[in-house]
Amino acid sequence: MADKSFANSEYIFREGESAAYAYIIKSGTVEITKHSADGEQVLAELAAPTIFGEMALIDGNPRSAGARAKENTVVTEVTADTFKTYLSKNPEAAV
């Protein structure tokens, strides 16, 4: 697992991309975004210590939404293998 910093308005990932990581917010705020006919919509605003981006690791589909730093933000990248190992050892976290 590695920490990565993102500046205000920088995308962590974009809708439709393939997934290599889930993320845990260490500091800052992340907006979850989705494109629609009306433009980009903010679906949620997340803060530490929230995990996000895990659905694409679980189902193997492209990212269903984007994630953008709302302010200077630090996240921890979690690989698919690490995430799946954690879930197998902590099944209560999967609900």
Predicted regions and their residues:
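Solvent-exposed strand-loop boundary residues in beta-sheet-rich modules
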Residues: 36-38
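Regulatory nucleotide-sensing modules
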Residues: 1-33
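Cyclic-nucleotide recognition modules
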Residues: 11, 44-95
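Short, mixed charged/polar active-site loops
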Residues: 40-42
